Regions:
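Compact Cys/His-rich metal-coordination microdomains
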Residues: 98-100
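Acidic, glycine-rich flexible loop segments
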Residues: 115-117
Length: 141
């Protein structure tokens, strides 16, 4: 009986795995984020329409990019997850995409967070967006 439980325990340990997708995605810090976005305010009013996005500075690693994807809002860290933090690794909004300012100009979809044209190790770091009513959303992690 002890052998049975010993073998069962070993099988259980071998079945556990880590998340290999995030193994090389260690450039961005896991900083606390808690931002209120009221779509009735002028600086966020364009988020009432699909495909529009805004940049919120001084949050996360490089600011936050928020986009209306048609079914709600999605929020991404504006720092390129495939670069060490630097001035050039802060992305700029280009329509429905975000482009890194470094020489390789990594480009990501703001709808999915995935890279465009080139397979990269890491996608954009996403933050949780929850509705708190009255056209107000909370962005947090």
């Amino acid at each position: 009986m002890k052998r049975f439980f010993g073998v069962l325990f070993l099988l259980f340990l071998m079945a556990c795995s880590n998340n290999d997708n995030l193994k090389n995605c260690n450039f961005l810090l896991n900083l606390g984020v808690n931002v209120s976005v009221n779509l009735n305010l002028p600086q966020y009013s364009q988020l009432q329409f699909t495909s529009n996005s805004v940049y919120i500075a001084n949050q996360g690693n490089g600011g936050i990019i928020v986009i209306n994807v048609g079914t709600g809002l999605r929020a991404w860290d504006a720092a390129d997850p495939n670069h060490t933090p630097s001035i050039c690794s802060i992305m700029e909004i280009d329509g429905v995409n975000a482009i890194c300012g470094c020489t390789d100009a990594n480009e990501y979809s703001l709808f999915t967070g995935g890279s465009i044209n080139v397979q990269l190790a890491c996608g954009l770091k996403e933050y949780r967006v929850t509705s708190s009513g009255n056209n107000t959303y909370i962005i947090s992690n």
